[in-house]
């Protein structure tokens, strides 16, 4: 509050004294945001090929296994954890191209790469299964973690794709203790030049 009781805007003050009005020129902030946007091309074992995909910090914390094929704490995700320490949004690009998808007689991995070799399919009899109408419980495992389960399925065509595998279009379900997906390979890193 200025001397004389008020802020000086116009010459209308009745009290004697010196009135001063300081106005600063607007200037750009020198502080940088610690939560911006970044881009990171990487050689990855899982994920879409040939496209840029965007991941938010909240998605990375919650769904890193679905997006990158590994749990948040896995050593394979250290570069991702480091960039998300100061970024809110990251655009990723998978450098390795022309990889092969792991597969078995029931399913094919969603993405090419050697991480698909850690997927396993387990087919068990459903508790409501009868001799006339066989029903199955089909589970998808990534390593030792169950990532999907579909219960009371009569045929392979009744299975819905999940975040890890696309199911075969034909064939018969049969009891299987565990059937790994095999043949997944990372492609080579392409030179952009």
Label for each model-derived stretch:
Residues 1-193:
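Surface-exposed assembly/interface segments
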């Amino acid at each position: 509050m200025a001397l004389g009781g008020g802020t000086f805007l116009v010459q209308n003050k009745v009290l004697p004294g010196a009135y001063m009005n300081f106005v600063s020129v607007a200037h750009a902030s020198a502080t940088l945001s610690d939560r911006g946007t970044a881009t990171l091309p990487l050689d990855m074992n899982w994920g879409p090929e040939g496209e840029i995909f965007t991941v938010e910090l909240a998605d990375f914390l919650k769904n890193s296994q679905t997006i990158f094929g590994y749990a948040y704490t896995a050593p394979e995700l250290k570069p991702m954890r480091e960039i998300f320490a100061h970024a809110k949004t990251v655009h990723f690009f998978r450098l390795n191209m022309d990889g092969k998808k792991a597969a078995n007689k029931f399913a094919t991995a969603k993405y090419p790469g050697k991480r698909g070799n850690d997927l396993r399919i387990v087919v068990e009899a459903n508790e409501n299964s009868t001799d006339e109408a066989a029903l199955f419980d089909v589970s998808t495992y990534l390593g030792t973690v169950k990532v999907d389960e579909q219960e009371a399925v009569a045929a392979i065509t009744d299975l819905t794709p999940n975040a890890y595998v696309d199911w075969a279009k034909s064939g018969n379900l049969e009891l299987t203790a565990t059937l790994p997906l095999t043949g997944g390979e990372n492609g080579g890193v392409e030179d952009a030049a």
